[in-house]
Amino acid sequence: MTKNKKYSYGTAGFRTKASDLEAAVYSSGVAAALRSMELKGKTIGVMITASHNPVEDNGVKIIDADGGMLAMEWEDKCTQLANAPSKAEFDFLIKQFLTPTTCQPKVIIGYDTRPSSPRLAELLKVCLDEMSASYIDYGYITTPQLHWLVRLINKSTAASFLEEGPPITEYYDTLTSAFSKIDPSMQDSPTVSRVVVDCANGVGSQPLKTVAGLVKDSLSIELVNTDVRASELLNNGCGADFVKTKQSPPLALEGKIKPNQLYASIDGDADRLIFYYINQNRKFHLLDGDKISTALVGYLNILVKKSGMPFSLGVVQTAYANGASTEYLQDLGITTVFTPTGVKHLHKAAKEFDIGVYFEANGHGTVLFSDKALANLAHPFFTPSPVQAAAIEQLQSYSVLINQAIGDAISDLLATISVLNALHWDASAWSNTYKDLPNKLAKVKVSDRTIYKSTDAERRLVSPDGLQEKIDALVAKYEKGRSFVRASGTEDVVRVYAEASTKQAADELCEKVCQLVL
């Protein structure tokens, strides 16, 4: 099946040059059909996208029946299918993974605006036809929208949804209706009444235009970088990854940014969100995933206390979360847990809480409400007072507004702005809730990355022997010092992260830890 190309299915599915992706797309179609059969005909999603990658890349990922990421045991099956050396081996694997059933497999398809996406989607359909699968093609759609639709279909009892699939208008109506119910009094004199959003010239442009039209009476959303026809513009000098990495606005906004106006950038498939602004002195301020997480959980904490509900509420972070954000959460009395890097780890840990919040610093994240929390909000076990009833209603609205399947830049945008208005925070007030510790991230080339083994959510090394003790001794010399070393998952490098009370100290600590690694 494959020639001189090795595929590996990870958190983002398969991702590589679009010209090398055919075998991965075909085998993913087979895997999606097999997974649907294993789940007795539940609907599975297949999304063709490479998110924030350059336009010449593409990818394919499978969305499981709960609307979340593919079950881990199926990641290996996808990898085996994509790397099958012959048709005979491919057919053998299909027989191995096949669950005998009379249920027809069901799949829904979506793709981003890359020029290679429609061609790859057609190949996917050929495969699904060969697997005798029923499928619905949603065309150009954001990754979080497809996750949301899979979850809705499999939770629904509506026959039309199961047979024809819900119209995408369900997504827009659900989000904007919930947004309008969140503290309507704030809409009379909102602190944030306008936001400018950089769409990365990606597939999120049209959905955001639709949302902007539906919420225009309470929020003005101005869109920039919306050209999806000129494919070379995708993620080029724009988008959440560019802004986060460069610590500067998209190139199209250079010199045009107005002081204290709130701006946001999404990525190419609209699952990441970053905010930013410039102050009166034209200094750039980034409001990343840590800042989004702390704002959301801070307000949800207020609502939980007002509601009288005994909900557990917590935030999930990785080692890359800025230490100042962790300290801020601890000062609020909010439980914070750490996991290894990767959305699948964060998502799993967030599900342990009644209300679990997770955001990577890159702006990918969401808020998960447990089934128990949703049941208690719908049917309180006590007679709530007017104040409690209002808080319960607000929490219900957030559980609907925020995508429960996966991180969603569009729903996160609306949720964050509603929180800023509820707290009466403008961009500056939000930024000043805590000051990020200066930090530096570096890469060190090594001959064998596998010897670097970590524990404590990748924050401490257990191998090579004695290296962690040397790092500890260095860190102890710096005020608010912290550093960790983590092996890359894809290349022979280790990543070194360091933070301290000043930029000079953070840079110096990072350099000294890099020297230890060498």
Swiss-Prot record:
Protein name, per record: Phosphoacetylglucosamine mutase 1
Cofactor(s) recorded in Swiss-Prot or TrEMBL: Mg(2+)
Compartments, record wording: Cytoplasm; Nucleus
Superkingdom as given in the UniProt entry: Eukaryota
Gene Ontology BP term (one): UDP-N-acetylglucosamine biosynthetic process
Residue sites binding substrate per the record: E360, A361, N362, R486, A487, S488, G489, T490, R495
Protein's UniProt keywords contain Zinc-finger: no
Reactions catalysed: N-acetyl-alpha-D-glucosamine 1-phosphate = N-acetyl-D-glucosamine 6-phosphate
Binding site for Mg(2+): S51, D267, D269, D271
Top EC category: isomerase
GO molecular function: magnesium ion binding; phosphoacetylglucosamine mutase activity
Pfam family, one: AMG1_II
Pathway this chain belongs to: Nucleotide-sugar biosynthesis; UDP-N-acetyl-alpha-D-glucosamine biosynthesis; N-acetyl-alpha-D-glucosamine 1-phosphate from alpha-D-glucosamine 6-phosphate (route I): step 2/2
Phosphoserine: residues bearing it: S51
UniProt modified residues of type Phosphothreonine: T49
Keyword annotations of the record: Carbohydrate metabolism, Cell wall biogenesis/degradation, Cytoplasm, Isomerase, Magnesium, Metal-binding, Nucleus, Phosphoprotein
Family from the record: Belongs to the phosphohexose mutase family.
Protein source organism: Schizosaccharomyces pombe (strain 972 / ATCC 24843)
Role summary: Catalyzes the conversion of GlcNAc-6-P into GlcNAc-1-P during the synthesis of uridine diphosphate/UDP-GlcNAc, which is a biosynthetic precursor of chitin and also supplies the amino sugars for N-linked oligosaccharides of glycoproteins.
InterPro entries: A-D-PHexomutase_a/b/a-I, A-D-PHexomutase_a/b/a-I/II/III, A-D-PHexomutase_C, A-D-PHexomutase_C_sf, A-D-PHexomutase_CS, AMG1_II, AMG1_III, PAGM
Gene3D superfamilies: Alpha-D-Glucose-1,6-Bisphosphate, subunit A, domain 3 (3.40.120.10), Alpha-D-phosphohexomutase, C-terminal domain (3.30.310.50)
